[in-house]
């Protein structure tokens, strides 16, 4: 082990990154500066909200920077003055250009929430669930100009259970990811970690989830719809259009269950005298365990339809 600790500049923005940063600090990693995205308004408020990474940096009294464009030439001298050994990037939220990737003395490394080369891109956790994967993980890699294509240093896998949501999987990946990242930083402190080239022929991509991606199409299979609901819970949330007493409204669906049942009329409400709503899909039925009608609180679908007759409610099919 060298006498001088390696100097690290940490780049990150959301809660996932904040938890990783705090873990590194608790384990005596010398973080000399923190870079996070600018504060933005959240929800209906116009007041900017501090990023989770900013809050951790402030609580540890670390130098904090929130440039509008991190790769701007004006900001480069600020980073260069720290003479950092490592740049560590975790869910920062912006592409980092080559002149910054070349700046640290040792490397610029990234914690990516998939088993690369699968699910390169902005939404690897959500996409892995939506695609019905049974396994995913984290990869610590060298950063290069091409997105998520650098040499891999360490990979750790985790199982995706049948009911696991995006939020739950994110926490599981954070736990294994922060330990893997700390181990890699220690490897750099001892020398040069081994690296493995990615096979680009095996690469798949995980583009950002848009709101329209989250609309349920009842013509699709029940399993696919169930996976979509899990993959966007809690954010941005799966949804569909319904008509309640003839008025069209948006229904958010956060928990479901696949029900074996022959289906030939997608979007039809399955006759049931009690319990949660069950909707026919392209192949089976989907039980709506937890729903939220626009303007209302989250509840079970049984609670939502209590006192409502079947002809008062209709699910709209694309």
From Swiss-Prot:
InterPro entries: Fmt, Formyl_trans_C, Formyl_trans_C_sf, Formyl_transf_N, Formyl_transf_N_sf, Formyl_transferase-like_C_sf, Met-tRNA-FMT_C, Met-tRNA-FMT_N. The keyword Acetylation does not apply. GO terms for cellular component: cytosol. (6S)-5,6,7,8-tetrahydrofolate binds at residues 114-117. The gene is fmt. This is Methionyl-tRNA formyltransferase. Coiled coil: none annotated. It comes from Protochlamydia amoebophila (strain UWE25). Keywords: Protein biosynthesis, Transferase. Belongs to the Fmt family. It catalyses: L-methionyl-tRNA(fMet) + (6R)-10-formyltetrahydrofolate = N-formyl-L-methionyl-tRNA(fMet) + (6S)-5,6,7,8-tetrahydrofolate + H(+). NCBIfam families: fmt. One of its GO terms (molecular function) is methionyl-tRNA formyltransferase activity. The keyword Protein biosynthesis applies. The lineage of its organism: Bacteria, Pseudomonadati, Chlamydiota, Chlamydiia, Parachlamydiales. It holds the Pfam family Formyl_trans_C. Its EC number is 2.1.2.9. CDD domains: FMT_core_Met-tRNA-FMT_N, Met_tRNA_FMT_C.
């Amino acid at each position: 082990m060298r006498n001088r600790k390696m100097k690290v500049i940490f780049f990150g923005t959301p809660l996932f990154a904040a938890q990783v940063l705090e873990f590194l600090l608790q384990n005596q990693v010398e973080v000399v500066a923190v870079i996070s995205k600018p504060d933005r308004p959240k929800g209906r408020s116009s007041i900017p909200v501090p990023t989770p990474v900013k809050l951790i940096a402030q609580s540890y009294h670390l130098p904090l920077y929130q440039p509008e464009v991190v790769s701007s030439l004006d900001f480069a001298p600020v980073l260069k003055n720290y003479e950092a050994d490592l740049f560590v990037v975790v869910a920062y939220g912006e592409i980092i250009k080559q002149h910054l990737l070349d700046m640290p003395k040792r490397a610029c490394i990234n914690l990516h929430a998939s088993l690369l080369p699968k699910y390169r891109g902005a939404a690897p956790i959500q996409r892995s669930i939506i695609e019905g994967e049974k396994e995913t993980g984290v990869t610590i890699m060298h950063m290069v100009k091409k997105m998520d294509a650098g040499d891999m240093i360490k990979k750790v896998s985790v199982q995706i259970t049948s009911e696991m949501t995006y939020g739950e999987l994110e926490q599981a990946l954070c736990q294994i990811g922060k330990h893997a990242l700390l181990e890699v930083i220690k490897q750099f402190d001892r020398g040069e970690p081994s690296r493995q080239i990615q096979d680009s022929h095996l690469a798949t991509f995980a583009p950002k989830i848009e709101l329209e991606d989250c609309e349920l199409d009842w013509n699709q299979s029940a399993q696919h719809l169930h996976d979509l609901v899990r993959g966007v819970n809690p954010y941005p949330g799966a949804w569909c259009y319904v008509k309640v007493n003839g008025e069209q409204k948006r229904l958010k669906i956060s928990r479901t269950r696949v029900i074996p049942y022959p289906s030939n009329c997608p979007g039809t409400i399955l006759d049931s005298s009690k319990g949660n709503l069950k909707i026919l899909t392209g192949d089976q039925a989907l039980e709506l365990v937890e729903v939220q009608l626009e303007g209302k609180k989250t509840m079970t679908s049984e609670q939502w339809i209590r006192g409502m007759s079947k002809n008062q409610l209709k699910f709209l099919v694309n």
